[in-house]
Structures are given as C-alpha cells and as structure tokens.
Amino acid sequence: MFRGATMVNLDSKGRLAVPTRYRESLNEESQGQMVCTIDLHQPCLLLYPLPEWEIIEQKLSRLSSMNPAERRVQRLLLGHASECQMDGAGRLLIAGTLRQHAGLNKEVMLVGQFNKFELWDEQTWYQQVKDDIDAEQSTQEPLSERLQDLSL
C-alpha cells in the first residue's frame, strides 16, 4: 500500500529516485518493474507496479473495441503505457512523452494512492490540493453513501 505525498526531483535524463521507504516493497512485489500511463481526468501520470498494471490490462481487455467510449479508454491508457524498470540506484526513467503530457519538470510530487502512485508537477499538485479543499468546503452536493459511512 502506497500513501503520502513526497517531493522528488527528476534528473536531466528524466529519472526520478523512488523514496527508500517504497523500494523494498516494489522490489518484492514487482522486481522493480513498473508501468506508467496518463490519468484520464487529471494532469498527472499513474505509476503502477507491474502486477497491479496487469490487473488493469485484464479489465481493459474485456472492454469492447466496437464501443467508441470503451475503445477510447483502451487507446488512451494502453497507448500511453510505458514500462520502466527501477535501476540499482532506485531510479525510474519516465518517458519524455509522458513527462510532457503531465507538464513534469524538475520538481515532481509522488503521491501514494493505495496500489499505485500519481506523479504531478509540484506546482500543479499544490494548486489541485487547494482546489480540492475549496470544492469540499463549498459543495452543496449530498455525500454519497460510501462517504457518509466513512468515519475519520
């Protein structure tokens, strides 16, 4: 399980150093093999350990290529999926096209989201957090049943 938000730097080659607290579990779970793709709804990237990504691929394979919306999701997620291998120094090379898509520069936020990470440009991340808090404070929408049952 991945949690927390950590600022990491991309080096000049587009590599990010995975925080040490995640390296051991990633090596155990996936031998450091990861898959990175775009997020369909946010200006960030999604980074999955390979076994978790394979579950996503199975779900995508069950979608109909004859349904335009389903094919679009397949095309976007699979078409942008890029495998990356954690090297001996715990670094992952993020493909240039993916970095460009998410507007990633030097400072990047690695955000744990249960079974995956999100990769955000640092400034975009902080703006998104502010926007999310503002939306929560001003929303008039009733909470879903799942959120009503969530006790923090």
Swiss-Prot record:
Residues 5-52, 81-124 form the SpoVT-AbrB domain. Disulfide bonds: none annotated. It is found in: Cytoplasm, Nucleoid. It comes from the Bacteria. PROSITE patterns: SPOVT_ABRB. Coiled coil: none annotated. Keywords: Cytoplasm, DNA-binding, Repeat, Repressor, Transcription, Transcription regulation. GO terms for biological process: negative regulation of DNA-templated transcription initiation. Its main location: cytoplasm. Gene3D superfamilies: Transcriptional regulator MraZ domain. One of its GO terms (cellular component) is cytoplasm. InterPro entries: MraZ (IPR003444), MraZ_C (IPR035644), MraZ_dom (IPR020603), MraZ_N (IPR035642), MraZ_sf (IPR038619), SpoVT-AbrB_dom (IPR007159), SpoVT-AbrB_sf (IPR037914). GO terms for molecular function: DNA-binding transcription factor activity; transcription cis-regulatory region binding. NCBIfam families: division/cell wall cluster transcriptional repressor MraZ. Forms oligomers. PANTHER family: TRANSCRIPTIONAL REGULATOR MRAZ. Negatively regulates its own expression and that of the subsequent genes in the proximal part of the division and cell wall (dcw) gene cluster. Acts by binding directly to DNA. May also regulate the expression of genes outside the dcw cluster. Belongs to the MraZ family. This is Transcriptional regulator MraZ. It comes from Yersinia pseudotuberculosis serotype O:1b (strain IP 31758). The lineage of its organism: Bacteria, Pseudomonadati, Pseudomonadota, Gammaproteobacteria, Enterobacterales.
